[in-house]
Amino acid sequence: MNSKVLITYCWNRVGYNIMRSLAAHDIDVYVADTSKRNICSMSKFVKGGYVYPDPFKEEEGFIKRLLEIIDHLRPEVLLPTHDESLVIAKNRDKFPSWLIIPVASYRLLADLSDKQISTSIAASLQVPTPHIFHNVEDVKSFPVVFKATVSNSAKDVYFPDSIEELLDLIHRYEGKKTLIQEKCKGCDFSVDCVRGKDFFQASVYRALVTKTEGGGTTTQRVIVDYPELVDYSKRILDKVDYLGVCGMDFKVDEETGQIGFIEINARYTGGLATPIAAGFDIPYIHYCLYTGKTFNRDIKIRIGTKTKWLLGDVITLVGRLVSFKLSRKELSQLLDFDFDAFDDFRKDDKRAILGEMSYYFEKLIKNRKLNP
């Protein structure tokens, strides 16, 4: 009998690439999400799908529903993929002792998700970090970065150009934890890591296109060789003894070589398709490390591998057109289809992208936003 894995937060391309990775190794993959129709539920590789309440608005109902699914399905592994990891880790003692949940402790996940705490950890390890302004009076030049200490996908991140804009943001976010930092120049680089008790492997990709201006969610990426960023990432994970999958984001000024640490994503990251396409099968390695299965540790990552998120580029194009901020160079890049793989489309599974499009369309109608 094949092993069963239940994956949560499966509306997007990340869950899709995890599902494909595990299914390729004859693992029966079941998915669960707040939505019934999405990229995973319409894939031919899924064995079954479930719906649960919003984990961030209905925590008790979410956990209760997960327990019902687990009791019915009896999976070997419950695999959280995004910020619901925190909710599951917080309630870990409510799950059966035989169930493998490959995430860190709630306390560690919460600390690493906090940009102020993670930046302090990085700075203590001599990892280059942007300067933090503790008082508005200390800001002498603009733009700066103003952001909530806990957020994702470039949400709640702003680049005020004046003291008036900054003060307005401070007023709007009164009572919430926020951070003011110097704005780093350069391009987004991300380090995808897997760390076990006797294992560490990482790959680095450079962003070619980001969905929002100033960085954030990437829609096109290329694998690069950047040992310095890998070393910085390993320092941080070793320091906190983090086990599992993790992403580190940096800004790099390629003209000066100046590096700036941005954040830690103590979970699977949006660019997951890129390392997988390059030969670094992160989901399967993660699964093996926690289940005791063997895998090929002679990992050869193919530098230069490029991937593209098709729907993400469409959303990016629309967003740039609406805001009148589309350059000829970026238009040419968005219309490029010369890639090694696509995040959300495979010829052997054409229906899946229809599920993704359906999900985004429903969110657009409901929320009037292109960033769900």
Give the ranges of each region predicted by the language model.
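Glycine-/Pro-rich loop/turn segments that contact NAD(P) or position catalytic residues
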Residues: 96, 107-128
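Structural element of the ATP-grasp superfamily
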Residues: 118-123, 180, 233, 286
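Active-site "cap" helix and flanking loop/linker of ATP-utilizing ligase/carboxylase catalytic domains
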Residues: 228-248, 252, 266-317
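ATP-grasp fold ATP-binding core
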Residues: 122, 131-134, 140-159, 175-186, ...
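Short acidic-hydrophobic, aromatic-tinged amphipathic segments that line or gate anion-handling sites
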Residues: 49-57, 131-135, 158-161
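ATP-binding N-terminal substructure of ATP-dependent carboxylate-amine bond-forming enzymes
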Residues: 1-103, 357-371
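Peripheral (often C-terminal) accessory segments that flank ATP-dependent C-N-forming ligase machineries
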Residues: 288-372
